[in-house]
């Protein structure tokens, strides 16, 4: 399978996307922060964020080196990634694949995995303490939309987060947002239609704890009723 290229240059140091005619494009992560997740890391110490970013970048580089040239240093996080790939039989096609609408936006997809001659899965590697599945869902939904614009004969099947932390790797499938929602995010300034019953982000980050707490409360309630 051969993927199409876009006339966009990515400067990794400055993290900028520029078309060959000089037009500067916006990245998807900045858009998500501005439109949907403005308080995602509010209150977090900048040093903590910087350390987390450095750790995440190191893991990304190791995974890319493994997929592209077979480099396999002794590292628990790389072992976790390789374990996920082997368990789910992910066939690496491309890393850091650049997609764009060539009008306003461009971004690099961490991983593209080949499914068959005209189908791929895409994935983003996350190294955060807790995985924000709603964020990844939006991020990869936009990536899938742009991917299919660049490659109209290839369909994106599944969207995955590959969550790696302290030597443990998990493959988590996330929902793909519909095209209307994605285009609304990309090309309108209207407020996003947010589900009023959706879990607030600060609670979503503690979802596992809340589920455990809810279960314990149900057990306690049954015990009280039995008295």
Name each model feature, range by range.
Residues 93-191:
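Mg2+/Mn2+-dependent nuclease catalytic core
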Residues 59-60, 111, 143, 213:
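A residue-level signal for conserved active-site and pocket-lining positions in enzyme catalytic cores
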Residues 199-227:
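Contiguous, amphipathic alpha-helical segments that mediate oligomerization or scaffolding
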Residues 192-200:
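DNA replication initiation modules
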Residues 15-19, 161-163, 226-227:
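Short polybasic amphipathic segments
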Residues 1-106:
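Metal-dependent nuclease catalytic cores that hydrolyze phosphodiester bonds in DNA/RNA
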Residues 47, 51, 131-135, 201:
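Conserved aromatic-histidine-acidic binding/catalytic patches
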Residues 67, 148-152, 218-221, 225:
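Hydrophobic/aromatic-lined pockets within catalytic cores
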